[in-house]
Curated annotation (Swiss-Prot):
Catalytic activity: ATP + H2O = ADP + phosphate + H(+)
Keywords recorded for this protein, A-Z: Acetylation, ATP-binding, Cytoplasm, Cytoskeleton, Deafness, Disease variant, Hydrolase, Intellectual disability, Isopeptide bond, Methylation, Non-syndromic deafness, Nucleotide-binding, Oxidation
UniProt GO molecular function: ATP binding; hydrolase activity; identical protein binding; profilin binding; protein kinase binding; structural constituent of cytoskeleton; structural constituent of postsynaptic actin cytoskeleton; ubiquitin protein ligase binding
Protein family per UniProt: Belongs to the actin family.
SUPFAM superfamilies: Actin-like ATPase domain
Organism per entry: Homo sapiens (Human)
Positions carrying Tele-methylhistidine: 73
Descriptive protein name: Actin, cytoplasmic 2
Lineage, broadest ranks: Eukaryota, Metazoa, Chordata, Craniata, Vertebrata
Length: 375
């Protein structure tokens, strides 16, 4: 009668939440990590208006809501809203009873310890899960690419990090984190579109700009040359129709926006670009393993989906590395979901089953158990 109970895999990103069942090859539910609350007083009685909306429903009613993201830079900043998102994931998206399934959650490396303790506490105390585990996002991406050695450059909506992994072990001293990711690029695009005379200010309008970014932006192989091309001809211009039917045209903004990944000074940040961060991460590793990292540089996360990003990374890292070094940038087509896919693989391995933190262990040790059991 022993029926295999599938584990749930939830990759809570700053921008999108990916959820589904271990063993599946793609997440069942992908929805924005947003909680929306009405901006105005309801006047029509019996409309069944709610005091909060989550995910796609919040997105579709965004014109009358104030949208908030409870996860900023990979760290949960509003636990009440986070609980709403998890509740929505279990009961509305996956339609499961959380008390019947082990749950695998993900988090960004170098997150505050309190963050994963609180995640653990909510899973066991609010949702009564039988078991749970918290995995590092980048490690899962490497699993998904079928490797045990490599450096993962994972860039999502809230945080970018480079994680060197050797024979399955993440090398914590060489992990670097950059708080520059998709949301900052969206904000930057809002700013440079304003310079063109289009005004985007509200939280709802930010979502429109995010869509423009996802559909039209790309990474230039040579930024200066691309700027010259854009100035001398209109070949790079594209138009976009806003929800109200107005059509806007964007030109050099298409590649100026993601260029900030390579030149954070565009955003007034003093950090290194993603290419230098990746290189610095490799240089913090033992000299003997660098060759393997250069040859296995894996891109993951939604912010690596820009056309041209892999070629540009190849060019930039080749310029930084020793001249004889073989450099290979791996950009799997499913990299938007590779963290989730890696989680699905991990949670369905027979060898992983002893790794879960059980409710019993939690009851004996409290939330701090998560630091001992999860890497």
């Amino acid at each position: 009668m022993e029926e295999e109970i599938a584990a749930l895999v939830i990759d809570n990103g700053s921008g999108m939440c990916k959820a589904g069942f271990a063993g599946d090859d793609a997440p069942r539910a992908v929805f924005p990590s947003i909680v929306g609350r009405p901006r105005h007083q309801g006047v029509m009685v019996g409309m069944g208006q709610k005091d909060s909306y989550v995910g796609d429903e919040a997105q579709s009613k965004r014109g009358i809501l104030t949208l908030k993201y409870p996860i900023e830079h990979g760290i949960v900043t509003n636990w009440d809203d986070m609980e709403k998102i998890w509740h929505h994931t279990f009961y509305n998206e996956l339609r499961v009873a959380p008390e019947e399934h082990p749950v695998l959650l993900t988090e960004a490396p170098l997150n505050p310890k309190a963050n994963r303790e609180k995640m653990t506490q909510i899973m066991f105390e609010t949702f009564n899960t039988p078991a749970m585990y918290v995995a590092i996002q980048a490690v899962l991406s490497l699993y998904a690419s079928g490797r045990t050695t490599g450096i993962v450059m994972d860039s999502g909506d809230g945080v970018t990090h480079t994680v060197p992994i050797y024979e399955g072990y993440a090398l914590p001293h060489a992990i670097l984190r950059l708080d520059l990711a998709g949301r900052d690029l969206t904000d930057y695009l809002m700013k440079i579109l304003t310079e063109r005379g289009y005004s985007f200010t509200t939280t709802a309008e930010r979502e429109i700009v995010r869509d423009i970014k996802e559909k039209l932006c790309y990474v230039a192989l040579d930024f200066e040359q691309e700027m010259a091309t854009a100035a001398s001809s209109s070949s790079l211009e594209k138009s976009y129709e806003l929800p109200d039917g107005q059509v806007i045209t964007i030109g050099n903004e298409r590649f100026r926006c993601p260029e900030a990944l390579f030149q954070p000074s565009f955003l007034g940040m003093e950090s290194c670009g993603i290419h230098e961060t990746t290189f610095n991460s490799i240089m913090k590793c033992d000299v003997d393993i660098r060759k393997d990292l250069y040859a296995n540089t894996v891109l993951s996360g939604g912010t690596t989906m820009y056309p041209g990003i892999a070629d540009r990374m190849q060019k930039e890292i080749t310029a930084l590395a020793p001249s004889t070094m073989k450099i290979k940038i791996i950009a799997p087509p499913e990299r938007k979901y590779s963290v989730w896919i890696g989680g699905s693989i991990l949670a369905s391995l027979s060898t992983f089953q002893q790794m879960w933190i059980s409710k019993q262990e939690y009851d004996e040790s409290g939330p701090s158990i998560v630091h001992r059991k999860c890497f």
